[in-house]
Curated annotation (Swiss-Prot):
Residues 1-7 are extracellular. GO terms for biological process: division septum assembly; septin ring assembly. It is a single-pass membrane protein. GO terms for cellular component: plasma membrane; septin ring. This is Septation ring formation regulator EzrA. It comes from Lactococcus lactis subsp. cremoris (strain MG1363). It is found in: Cell membrane. Keywords: Cell cycle, Cell division, Cell membrane, Coiled coil, Membrane, Septation, Transmembrane, Transmembrane helix.
Length: 576
């Protein structure tokens, strides 16, 4: 026999042994799962479901409880008679398939059986829980009934012992107590006839009603006190305040009808009492809040009129005097204006304003006469009179403020003239000082733009002297000339300083540069250009710039150094 054949035989034997081992292993695994299914089936079947159902049957349930119990009982009957038999059949089929080495079909059958028993276990657990709930509900009802009855009995006793605190609401409370008692009777009937679930619902409703009624009874005494004592007392006090208000000759605004408002308050009080008997506590509280708000509103109206009267009596007594005081001020102000206009031209229409104040005073005087007549007639609310009095006082205060402002303006004219005169004299002196300062520099001449600036500034100052010398001075014109002269003097001083500084520095730099003139042609040419600008063109700024650039060529920094020394030692000019 060849070696190839031997190898094939060995391989075949190995395959057969491996397949046999696999078959034995698969069969063992499936067999273990089948045994586990058998154990789960026995455990499920051994549960005391039937005994639990039989114990509930003895309770003789009715109504909703009976309906629920029948559903659970029917479900158990279906499981015990059909599902268990079907499960047995599936397990037996799996055993047959496994014994005949139909491994894959056996595994599928076992998987189906496992799913089926898992569903059955869930159903059985649901049945047991449902049945247990019926039993538990009956126990809870038995335990809870006494607690609920105690709540009810305590409530009834409290209401009976404190009937005087509830006023007319006692009848409605007794009706609600009777309804709750009926609910307890209904519970007893349902629970004793075997319907614990529906009985539990009725008991819960009765307990909720008891608790709610308890909460209501705790609030009612406070509302009763407010409705029957506090509010009537407040309304009585309000009526007394109203009577006193009228007796003291006060007049209410047209939009306030006192009788209607008092009747309205009484209506809301009666409405709150009616709502309380209906246990509409939120609406009762809203009505009482509304009453409180409207009572306070009436008191606020009274207080406003009292306050207005005090204001009217305080201010109206001095209105005539105040008007006369302002009128005298106006007359004096007109005289002052006439006097001032002899020396000054007024451009603010002061006289027109003062005459306008006089006309306004006549109008206000007529208003005051009417106000006083209305006060004496006692036919208009003081709040209205107070507004008119305040309006007159405010108008008089505005007139007086404007009178003071005009008077201060007139009084200040002489001071403004004096200040302008001093400024003109100072500027004139400074111009002469500037002229002398420039002359001391011994310059070959002055640039045209500088001369124009100097003479223009001098003309400004002379115009200021001219305006100040007029018979009637226009102070606005004077102030304008002071402003422009001040600006011109500032510009002239800066121009003078720049001119003289650059002229002096240009000369110093030219002298310093002469040391390089013979040895450096560029320096010689620069000096020549700088001298040309200095002596012929009188352009001292240009001459300074030219010689500075020239020096920078041969000795960088020399111009800056010399300029620094100059400015450090330079004395302050007299015109600054």
């Amino acid at each position: 026999m060849s070696s190839t054949v031997i190898i094939l035989i060995v391989v075949l034997l190995v395959i057969l042994v491996a397949f046999y081992a696999f078959a034995i292993l698969m069969r063992k695994k499936t067999e273990d799962r089948i045994l586990a299914l058998e154990e789960r089936k026995e455990s499920l079947f051994d549960l005391p479901v039937q005994e639990e159902i039989d114990s509930v049957k003895k309770m003789h349930l009715v109504g909703q409880s009976q309906t629920i119990f029948r559903e659970w009982n029917q479900k158990w009957l279906d499981l015990s008679s059909n599902s268990f038999a079907d499960l047995e059949e599936h397990i037996f089929e799996a055993e047959q398939l496994n014994d005949s080495f139909h491994f894959f079909r056996a595994r599928e059958s076992v998987a189906d059986s496992e799913a089926q028993i898992e569903m059955m276990e869930g159903d059985v657990e649901g049945i047991r829980q449902g049945v247990a709930q019926l039993v538990e509900q009956e126990k809870r009802n038995s335990n809870k009934i006494q607690e609920s009855l105690d709540l009810y009995d305590n409530l009834r006793s409290d209401i009976a012992d404190n009937a005087d605190l509830y006023g007319t609401v006692i009848t409605e409370l007794e009706k609600h107590l009777a309804n709750i008692e009926t609910e307890f009777s209904q519970f007893v009937t349902l629970n004793s006839t075997g319907d614990p679930i529906e009985a539990a619902e009725v008991l819960e409703t009765a307990e909720e009603h008891t608790i709610a009624l308890r909460a209501i009874t705790e609030q009612i005494p406070s509302f009763i006190k407010t409705i029957e004592k506090d509010v009537p007392k407040r309304l009585e006090e309000l009526q007394e305040a109203s009577d006193k208000f009228i007796a003291e000759d006060y007049i209410l605004p047209e939009n306030v009808n006192l009788k209607e408002r008092m009747d309205d308050l009484q209506h809301h009080l009666e409405e709150s009492s009616s709502l309380l008997e209906q246990f509409e506590l939120d609406r009762v509280e809203a009505e009482l809040d509304l009453i409180q708000e409207r009572v306070e509103e009436l008191y606020s109206i009274f207080e406003r009129e009292y306050s207005a009267r005090r204001n009217v009596e305080k201010r109206s007594s001095v209105l005539k005097e105040y008007i006369e005081h302002i009128r005298v001020n106006n007359k004096n102000l007109l005289l002052e204006i006439d006097h001032v206009t002899q020396a000054y031209i007024l451009s603010g229409n002061e006289k027109g304003y003062v005459r306008g104040y006089q006309e306004h005073l006549e109008s206000l005087d007529a208003d005051v006469d009417e106000i006083i007549a209305n006060i004496e007639a006692k036919a208009i609310p003081y709040s209205s009179l107070s507004r008119r009095v305040n309006s007159v006082v405010n108008a008089l205060e505005d007139i007086e403020k404007n009178q003071i402002k005009i008077s201060e303006t007139l009084s200040g004219l002489r001071d403004e003239e004096r200040a302008a005169q001093e400024i003109a004299e100072r500027f004139d002196s400074e111009l002469r000082t500037i002229k002398r300062y420039v002359e001391k520099c011994n310059l070959p001449g002055l640039p045209k733009d500088y001369l124009d600036l100097f003479f223009m500034t001098g003309d400004r100052v002379q115009n200021l002297f001219k305006e100040l010398g007029r018979v009637r001075i226009n102070i606005d014109t004077i102030n304008h000339l002071v402003d422009v002269s001040t600006e011109d003097m500032h510009v002239l001083k800066e121009a003078t300083t720049n001119l003289t500084d650059h002229a002096v520095l240009a000369e110093q730099l030219i002298q310093y540069a002469n040391r390089y003139k013979a040895s450096n042609e560029q320096v010689a040419q620069g000096i020549s250009r700088a001298l040309q600008l200095f002596e012929n063109s009188r352009d001292y700024d240009g001459s300074f710039d030219e010689i500075s650039k020239t020096l920078e060529i041969v000795e960088p920094g020399a111009a800056s150094r010399i300029s620094g020394v100059y400015f450090k030692n330079k004395p302050t000019p007299d015109y600054l």
